[in-house]
From Swiss-Prot:
Protein name: Chaperone protein DnaJ
Cofactor(s) required for function per UniProt: Zn(2+)
Function recorded in the entry: Participates actively in the response to hyperosmotic and heat shock by preventing the aggregation of stress-denatured proteins and by disaggregating proteins, also in an autonomous, DnaK-independent fashion. Unfolded proteins bind initially to DnaJ; upon interaction with the DnaJ-bound protein, DnaK hydrolyzes its bound ATP, resulting in the formation of a stable complex. GrpE releases ADP from DnaK; ATP binding to DnaK triggers the release of the substrate protein, thus completing the reaction cycle.
Localization: Cytoplasm
SUPFAM superfamilies linked: Chaperone J-domain, DnaJ/Hsp40 cysteine-rich domain, HSP40/DnaJ peptide-binding domain
Length: 376
C-alpha cells in the first residue's frame, strides 16, 4: 500500500514551522499512543505512521529531500522502527506537551536567552536553459541582521542588559491557579529574561535591524519547478546571539517558447509543409544545444513523434540525459492563388478510385458501422 503524504499524516501545511510541526505531532501521538489504545492495532499503526512522518519532517536534511523527491528521497535513511518506543511512553509525551504550561509536569523551561532566527523563503524564476544547464544568480533578500552598533545585545554601546528581577532571567513566571501552578510569559521582560534600561539608538533595543542582503545562489543543473535550494545560515539573525535561520530558494521554471518539460524529457511541436509530409525531407529543429537535422520520411502523418535521444535533460542526481520528442504538425497551405487551386483540383482528380487516406477510410467505416448499429 502506498505511503500517505507525511504532511497529511500530521495534518499540517507544507510550510509548517518547526514549533507547529512539533505541536501537531504531539497531538497525533497522544491520540494514538498504544498506552492509551491497548490492543488497538489500527491506533498503533497510526502512531507508527505519525512517528515516521515526524522523524523525517523534524530533520532539516531529510525534510528537504522529502520536499524535493517525496518518499523516494528518504528511503533507506532509517526510521523510528515502527514501535511505541520510537518516541517514548505516553507520560513522556504528556509531560513534554504540558511542561510549558503546568509547572509540575516536566519542570518547565525558561524562554529567555538566545533563540534561532526564522527561516526565509525566496522564489527564483529561471529560464528553461538555466534550469537545465545550471547557473549562478544574484538575489536580494530583505531580512533581519544582527545590529552592528550594539553587537546584537540591544543595549546602548557602553551599557549592558540586566537580568529581569521579576522572573530571575527565566523569561517566565509561575502563578497559582487552583490546584495548578500555571507558567506564563514574564510581563516585565516579555519573555526575554532581561531588561534594557538604555536601549541602542539604532535597533531600539531589539538587537536586530532590517537589511536587504545580496546573495549568490548556485543553481545545479537539472533543477525543475518545485525544487528547493537551501542556503544554511542565510535566514534571519537569531535573537540574543542565537544562530541564524536558513534561506530556502524555491525554483520556478518559466514557460519556454518551444519546449515543454516532463521529467527528463523535452517536447516540442515542429510544423512541416504538406509537401514535406508527403514526399519526406530533412528539417532543422531546435534543441537546447543548437539546431539539428531531423529526417522526415515520406507519407508522414500529422502528430507523429520523432525521438532525438540524449537531447533532453540530465537529472539533478545524475544519470543519462532524457530525450527530445518532436511532434510534427502538418500545415494546410493558405492564401492560395487561382492557379494553385486549379493544380490541386487536378491532383485531387488523380486520387479518385484509390485509397490514400487510411485513417479517413477507417473513420468512415467506423461511422457507417456506428449508425448501422443504431437502426430502429
Amino acid at each position: 500500500m502506498a505511503k500517505r503524504d507525511y504532511y497529511e499524516v500530521l495534518g499540517v501545511a507544507r510550510d509548517v514551522s518547526e514549533q507547529d510541526l512539533k505541536k501537531a505531532y504531539r497531538k497525533v501521538a497522544m491520540k494514538f499512543h498504544p498506552d492509551r489504545n491497548p490492543d488497538d492495532a489500527s491506533a498503533e499503526e497510526k502512531f507508527k505512521e505519525a512517528s515516521e512522518a515526524y522523524e523525517v519532517l523534524s530533520d532539516k536534511q531529510k525534510r528537504a529531500a522529502y520536499d524535493q523527491f517525496g518518499h523516494a528521497g528518504v528511503e533507506g535513511q532509517g526510521g523510528m522502527g515502527g514501535g511505541a518506543e520510537g518516541f517514548g511512553s505516553f507520560s513522556d509525551i504528556f509531560g513534554d506537551v504540558f511542561g510549558d504550561i503546568f509547572g509540575g509536569a516536566g519542570g518547565g523551561r525558561g524562554r529567555g536567552g538566545p533563540s534561532r532566527g526564522a527561516d526565509l523563503r525566496y522564489t527564483l524564476d529561471l529560464s528553461l536553459e538555466d534550469a537545465v544547464r545550471g547557473t549562478s544568480v544574484k538575489i536580494k533578500v530583505p531580512t533581519l541582521v544582527s545590529c552592528t552598533n550594539c553587537g546584537g545585545s540591544g543595549a546602548k554601546p557602553g551599557t549592558t542588559a540586566t537580568t529581569c528581577n521579576t522572573c530571575g532571567g527565566h523569561g517566565q513566571v509561575r502563578m497559582q491557579q487552583g490546584f495548578f501552578s500555571v507558567q506564563q510569559t514574564c510581563p516585565t521582560c516579555r519573555g526575554q529574561g532581561k531588561t534594557i534600561s538604555d536601549p541602542c539608538n539604532k535597533c531600539h533595543g531589539h538587537g536586530r535591524v532590517e537589511e536587504t542582503k545580496t546573495l549568490s545562489v548556485k543553481v545545479p543543473a537539472g533543477v525543475d519547478t518545485g525544487d528547493r535550494i537551501r542556503l544554511a545560515g542565510e535566514g534571519e539573525a537569531g535573537a540574543d546571539g542565537g544562530p541564524s535561520g536558513d534561506l530556502y530558494v524555491q525554483v520556478h521554471v518559466k514557460d519556454h517558447e518551444f519546449f515543454q518539460r516532463e521529467g527528463r524529457n523535452l517536447y516540442c511541436e515542429v510544423p512541416i509543409s504538406i509537401f514535406d509530409a508527403c514526399l519526406g525531407g530533412d528539417l532543422e529543429v531546435p534543441t537546447l544545444d543548437g539546431r539539428v537535422k531531423l529526417k522526415v520520411p515520406a507519407e508522414t502523418q500529422t502528430g507523429k513523434l520523432f525521438r532525438l535521444r540524449g537531447k533532453g535533460v540530465t537529472p539533478i542526481r545524475g544519470g543519462a540525459a532524457g530525450d527530445l520528442l518532436c511532434r510534427v504538425i502538418v500545415e494546410t497551405p493558405v492564401n492560395l492563388s487561382n492557379k494553385q487551386k486549379e493544380l490541386l483540383e487536378q491532383l485531387k482528380d488523380t486520387f479518385k478510385g484509390t485509397q490514400h487516406s487510411p485513417k479517413q477510410q477507417s473513420w468512415f467505416e467506423g461511422m457507417k458501422n456506428f449508425f448501422g448499429d443504431m437502426k430502429m
